[in-house]
Amino acid sequence: MEFPDLGKHCSEPTCKQLDFLPITCDACKQDFCKDHFSYVGHKCPFAFKKDVQVPVCPLCNAPIPVKRGEIPDVVVGEHMDRDCTFHPGRNRNKVFTHRCSKEGCRKKEMLQLACAQCHGNFCIQHRHPLDHNCQAGSSSASRGRTSTSRAAEQKPSGVSWLAQRLRRTVK
């Protein structure tokens, strides 16, 4: 039993199939079945307005114009071979850029480890004030304060707290 009022007929002249879930073309605004809804499937006369692709180069992030009828993958490949400004061997970013400020130490770290007292940049081995002979914390005013009053003024971070605990157990 057919329901002629339910659904719509495909607008493709060679099909005219009654489709219960028709798809409307966003370019020509006609209804099509699942086989003819693509621009190529029904030879849409307004496809040039909608079927535009501008791929982006995965290396240099530049938009690459693609002419009508060209395959985007081929155009991107040609761009990467000829016109791409990114050269993997030349533009390599350094990872270990933060050099230790301790005299005689030449280590470099990925992350900046700044001393809270003298604000110098140090490697993991010299990151604590006692390890790099910190000059900012050696004033007479800072020596006069007790360790409990220092802890009350500023709450130590988890890393520094753990380091202090480990130093106490090692000594």
Curated annotation (Swiss-Prot):
Keywords: Cytoplasm, Metal-binding, Nucleus, Repeat, Zinc, Zinc-finger. One of its GO terms (molecular function) is zinc ion binding. Zn(2+) 4 binds at C115, C118, H132, C134. Residues 136-151 have a biased composition (Low complexity). Gene3D superfamilies: AN1-like Zinc finger. Its main location: cytoplasm. A zinc finger (AN1-type) spans 4-52, 94-142. The keyword Coiled coil does not apply. It is found in: Cytoplasm; Nucleus. This is AN1-type zinc finger protein 2A. The lineage of its organism: Eukaryota, Metazoa, Chordata, Craniata, Vertebrata.
